[in-house]
């Protein structure tokens, strides 16, 4: 018996998810994320603060973005097959940023 054909998802499927639904798109497959735990959020908040302070104390030009923040690591024309939401992203190259997030890998 043949295996059922696996559906390939696109960035449009990610955009169509209900508000608050967190997921990543990797090679055409959607990976849903469970809500973060309280401990996870505490650690994320601590790291976000420490990284921001480190950058500011050194007069750095980078920006820190905690999740949810959209990262499009690879772009090939209009065919976006990867969409990630890292816990923390540090962006130093402002040309990577637009209203939707970061285009290219975070720094």
For the regions a protein language model found, what residue spans apply to each?
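Gly/Pro/Ser/Thr-rich low-complexity, intrinsically disordered segments predominantly at protein N-termini
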Residues: 1-107
